[in-house]
Amino acid sequence: MPTINQLIRHERKKVVKRKKTPALQGCPQRRGVCTRVYTTTPKKPNSALRKVARVRLTNGLEVTAYIPGEGHNLQEHSVVLIRGGRVKDLPGVRYHIIRGTLDTSGVQDRRQRRSKYGAKRPK
């Protein structure tokens, strides 16, 4: 515990909060172009082939974004919209691609949580 004199000589340091989605620069979403679409494997207890894409954003930054849902139509030069939100078992993946916008199609035959995957209401 510092004395009053110590506080007068050196003021307390502010704790700097780290942004969880720095590439969005305070925006809710950002547009970008896929530079590479590939699969990667998750961290230790899990096993799968997770679909991810490298995306060059309109602000010039390049990030890795997760492609949610079953099946996708993305390839190189696809224009996508990304949002914040990390994938817990993929290190370095801090963003999600939004399904059903721009060049990204919605998930086919999706019946529950459709709005999260850009799927239309089934007839």
UniProtKB/Swiss-Prot annotation:
Keywords (A to Z) from UniProt: Methylation, Ribonucleoprotein, Ribosomal protein, RNA-binding, rRNA-binding, tRNA-binding
Residues modified to 3-methylthioaspartic acid: 89
Keyword Ribosomal protein: yes
Domain of life: Bacteria
PROSITE patterns assigned to the protein according to its UniProt record, in alphabetical order: RIBOSOMAL_S12
Residue stretches of biased makeup (Basic residues): 111-123
GO cellular component, one term: small ribosomal subunit
The keyword Ribosomal protein is annotated on this UniProt entry: yes
A UniProt-annotated Pfam family: Ribosom_S12_S23
Annotated GO MF terms: rRNA binding; structural constituent of ribosome; tRNA binding
Example of a GO biological process term: translation
Positions of region (Disordered): 102-123
Assembly behavior: Part of the 30S ribosomal subunit. Contacts proteins S8 and S17. May interact with IF1 in the 30S initiation complex.
Function: With S4 and S5 plays an important role in translational accuracy. Interacts with and stabilizes bases of the 16S rRNA that are involved in tRNA selection in the A site and with the mRNA backbone. Located at the interface of the 30S and 50S subunits, it traverses the body of the 30S subunit contacting proteins on the other side and probably holding the rRNA structure together. The combined cluster of proteins S8, S12 and S17 appears to hold together the shoulder and platform of the 30S subunit.
Family affiliation: Belongs to the universal ribosomal protein uS12 family.
HAMAP family: Ribosomal_uS12_B
Name of the protein in its database record: Small ribosomal subunit protein uS12
Originating species: Lawsonia intracellularis (strain PHE/MN1-00)
Lineage: Bacteria, Pseudomonadati, Thermodesulfobacteriota, Desulfovibrionia, Desulfovibrionales
